Amino acid sequence: MKPQKSLRARAMDILSRQEVSRIGLKRKLAPHAESEEELENVLNEFAERNWQSDLRYAEAYIRSKSRKHGSLRLKQALAQQGIDEETSRNLLPDRSSEKQAAIDVLRKKFKHPAADLKEKQKQARFLAYRGFDADTVQTALKHAWDENWEDGC
């Protein structure tokens, strides 16, 4: 039988594999903590030593998801992980790169422009589900298959 890992060792193990928000780390460690105080002490120590950083987590999350998802969805996901709105707003991609991401996602999913209103609505719903705002969705639908579309034109 293996000896039980300490809470500190479990936290180090989790953080060695991926960036995790404070709330995410707390959720993963809570079942193994003997008390809330012990858990908070470990979380505070890791934050003080900069082994766990919500800012690094937010940067990594946005870097990995921003090519497929819009700012609304990214903001909501970060808020669920306890990242404040100001931090997430500062890290989100600018409008032109978000519009380009919407166009790229649309082109990948749908190989041709919408033939009728029903298909156009389907494409719009798809982008909205991905977290793109209404203005970005309209721009993407309008310019996705333009040959001369450049970022932000």
From Swiss-Prot:
Name the source's superkingdom. Bacteria
What is the similarity comment for this entry? Belongs to the RecX family.
Native source organism of the sequence: Neisseria meningitidis serogroup C / serotype 2a (strain ATCC 700532 / DSM 15464 / FAM18)
Against HAMAP family, the record matches this protein to: RecX
* Alphabetical keyword list: Cytoplasm
Q: Where are the transmembrane segments?
A: none
Please state what the protein is called. Regulatory protein RecX
Q: Predominant location of this chain?
A: cytoplasm
Q: Which GO terms describe its cellular component?
A: cytoplasm
Presence of keyword Hydrolase: no
The cellular location(s) given in this protein's UniProt record come to: Cytoplasm
Functional description taken from the UniProt entry: Modulates RecA activity.
Q: Read off the PANTHER family from this record.
A: REGULATORY PROTEIN RECX FAMILY PROTEIN
One GO BP: regulation of DNA repair
